[in-house]
From Swiss-Prot:
HAMAP family: Ribosomal_bL35 (MF_00514). InterPro entries: Ribosomal_bL35, Ribosomal_bL35-like, Ribosomal_bL35_CS, Ribosomal_bL35_sf. It comes from Paraburkholderia phymatum (strain DSM 17167 / CIP 108236 / LMG 21445 / STM815). GO terms for molecular function: structural constituent of ribosome. One of its GO terms (biological process) is translation. Belongs to the bacterial ribosomal protein bL35 family. It comes from the Bacteria. Keywords: Ribonucleoprotein, Ribosomal protein. This is Large ribosomal subunit protein bL35. It holds the Pfam family Ribosomal_L35p. One of its GO terms (cellular component) is cytosolic large ribosomal subunit.
Length: 65
């Protein structure tokens, strides 16, 4: 059986919290920000949790987290 490895791209994007939820950054805030309202950009600040439907995929990419 081959060695299990962490997907490094996923390790840079996700953080597993002690309770088991996975934290991720918000999308749509890197560029083309001039046409977005201040309120919209403000709501994109901070991190949010990965949705339940994507959780198994993310955990499979992070076997040691």
């Amino acid at each position: 059986m081959p060695k299990m490895k962490t997907k490094k791209s996923a390790a840079k994007r996700f953080v597993v919290r002690p309770g088991g939820t996975v934290k991720r950054g918000q999308a749509f805030k890197r560029h083309i920000l001039t046409k977005k309202t201040t309120k919209n950009k403000r709501h994109l600040r901070g991190a949010t949790a990965v949705h339940d439907s994507d959780l198994n995929s993310v955990r499979a990419m992070l076997p040691f987290a």
